[in-house]
């Protein structure tokens, strides 16, 4: 389990390593996370190291190695990661897309689509389903692809190890079915909505969190209705 700041720092270090070949300085980390002092960065680095996400190399300045990322295998850049959602994130303050994988062609490059925001979704204990359209957000058409889409504001931290944070806007493609491993909007007993990973277990359905602090829910199919699949995230800083 990672906190929001731990996740943001891990991602920042990994991106800098890929771009420049060296990790950022502590001052750069402090500025990137908008912290007042480097002591906060030291605590975050220690927490990431204790959880096995990074390794500090001895006797070398600014020597940090990323060992793994949430929902990926041991090598973040390799092909041995286990199957799962790696979110495409639109960063609201920068106005650019950071795709985890290509989600569409180039025909719609530059075009945006108004996506209705339908309320909140629990990434934690299921909350009552909300059906009220409050407003819209503009999304790149080539990120959304085909089909109908809507957005839900994430509440809770049960999917944090999949890179889905409290306060994110989840971009959902409408769908009434799912494959094992998909992250879905699941409506339970026609009254509670939750964002979880979908798996079939024999004749039952498992709704799995991506946070060890939460339990997997095993339910009969007649109690679960799929309302869409997660395809991306919109995040403001």
Swiss-Prot record:
Pfam families from the entry?
LexA_DNA_bind, Peptidase_S24
What residues are annotated to bind DNA?
26-46
InterPro entries listed in its UniProt record: LexA, LexA-like, LexA/Signal_pep-like_sf, LexA_DNA-bd_dom, LexA_repressor, Peptidase_S24_LexA, Peptidase_S24_S26A/B/C, WH-like_DNA-bd_sf
Domain of life, per lineage? Bacteria
> Molecular function (GO) terms listed?
DNA binding; serine-type endopeptidase activity
Site annotation (Cleavage): which residues?
123-124
Instruction: State the function annotated in the UniProt record.
Output: Represses a number of genes involved in the response to DNA damage (SOS response), including recA and lexA. In the presence of single-stranded DNA, RecA interacts with LexA causing an autocatalytic cleavage which disrupts the DNA-binding part of LexA, leading to derepression of the SOS regulon and eventually DNA repair.
Subunit details: Homodimer.
Q: Which family does it belong to?
A: Belongs to the peptidase S24 family.
The name this protein carries in UniProt is: LexA repressor
Q: Taxonomy-wise, where does this protein's organism fall, top ranks first?
A: Bacteria, Pseudomonadati, Pseudomonadota, Alphaproteobacteria, Hyphomicrobiales
